[in-house]
Amino acid sequence: MRREPHPFSGAIYEAIGDGLVRVDDPAKGKSGVFRYDGTWIEGELTHADPQLLLYVGGPDLPPGRDVYWGFLPPLEDEKTTMPAGGTLRAFENAGSQPPKVVGRYVGDPGVETPEGMRSSSHVPQDFLLENDRKRELLPAVYWKEAPYPGGPAKVPVARYHDKRFHDLEVEHIWKKVWQMVCREDDIPEVGDYHLYEIAHLQYLVVRTGPNEIKAHVNACLHRGRQLRECHGKKATEFRCPYHGWTWNIDGSMRLMTAEWDFPGVREDVSQLAGAKVHTWGGFVFINPDPDAIPFEEYTGPEMLEHYAKIKLQNRYKQADIVKVIRANWKVAMEAFLEGWHTLATHPQMLLAGTEVTDGRYDVFGNWGRLGHLTSGAASPNRGIIPSREQVLESHRATADFNREFLRGLIGEEVEQFTDAELNETSFSNLFPNFSPWGGWGRIVYRFRPSGDNPDECLMHVMLLAPWAEGKPKPPPREQRFLGPDDPWTLAPELGSLAKIFEQDCRNIPEIHVGLKTKQPPYIWYSAYQESVIRAFHDNYARRLGLAEGE
């Protein structure tokens, strides 16, 4: 059973079984019992932090699965090997855990910098880069800064629930942008295909050759019947179950039953309609727009350079989960486009000493880079602000640990990477909905509307484990589907991330409901910490042709 102090009050939250949590607050001399959903049961203490209640008393992982997601063994039958002498190993050997950091809330006053206001824990990124012990190996893009100008800014709430905006998205986004479909490893053999669904649009993405992938609209050219209703393997044709018209996997016509009754029609139905296809980093992308700009132009050079060294195409997909969320896809996605929410949403993470307050936020066209580098165990809202020298010392110690941990996974290839690359876990975003983490972070997010319902979405999470170049990979992990009421802990392959997602998804549906009643009917997004969200909405408004205030 879990037992945690609150990072601000020091009150002890202790699971007592059956989804109940006892909270003892010595400072107030009060205690109470609550359900993990926040419902008060008994006691003088009648209010407690709902997010910590959920973490302590909510759905839990099976024994042995509550492992930090970055240290999960790529394969379930393997064990994680920690570097000898590493910080975590030292605590394990001592039979204890790192001390929990508790401190009174004092607030973060911020600090003025040449680039604008930042958290008072701010350490210039160049300081860490200039003192990198392998500075000569740093990619040039690590030095580039591109904070998004302006802000704070208002965004109308109608964008999140009005069906009109969903319909505009279909026409001006989903029919026009490069969007991730699957991993190449998901369709490894000729004839393997993936059914990609976005709003009411459907595409069959099929491997037609060892180095060729095509995308076809999933509709018979006779009466429109879907050609396939799920993913599949080793297809040699796509035959319509209605009247038997059949196309080869490259989209060319194979058989037209009763052709005698369709004089002059064969030429019009001889090739399935399709979409452009591109592969990058082991991912498969499509763009339905025949006039679409090349993928490399869409992403911009900064994104391609940023990921080049880490070779996402070599990764092994160790987890693949899709969950239905009762919220608009933008509401869900924006919960993962800033780190500031850690303060209230994930209070247990503050017990390690950090708030994720000093990440760098950059915007390069369609690609936003979030949380590029952070300043160690700073917690400015509790007055914990380490010096630059302390930040650098922590940064290097973490890099040393990560280097030795990764050596066990990718061997001597790890020597190609700098301190900054070893520590980076930026949660970046390629417009509109694709977020592969940078550095050696394993997480990939994708958010899509669930059919034509603007009040529901699909949150897709993958974990891509480091994998040695040239080492044979087993088949990728099969996808797990979770319904709207299923807890993330039903996906133990996520490790500790499952508990974190439970907290995020405690907020997301309630945000969506609140936006429908909010007055005034707009959201304020901040100048810096929510700048990538502002950039997203500016891009969104341009593509949809929205007037000011829409």
PLM region spans:
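C-terminal catalytic domain of Rieske-type non-heme iron oxygenases
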Residues: 102, 107-118, 122, 212, ...
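Short beta-strand micro-motifs enriched in acidic
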Residues: 14-18, 206-208, 448-452
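N-terminal pre-ligand scaffold of iron-sulfur
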Residues: 98, 104-230, 276-279
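Mixed-charge, Lys/Arg-enriched low-complexity segments
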Residues: 34-92, 99
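A short beta-strand micro-motif
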Residues: 2-8
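A short, structured beta-strand/loop element
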Residues: 14-34
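Rieske [2Fe-2S] iron-sulfur-binding domain
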Residues: 186-290, 294-306
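Short Pro/Gly-enriched beta-strand edge/turn motifs at strand-loop
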Residues: 175-186, 256-260, 425-431
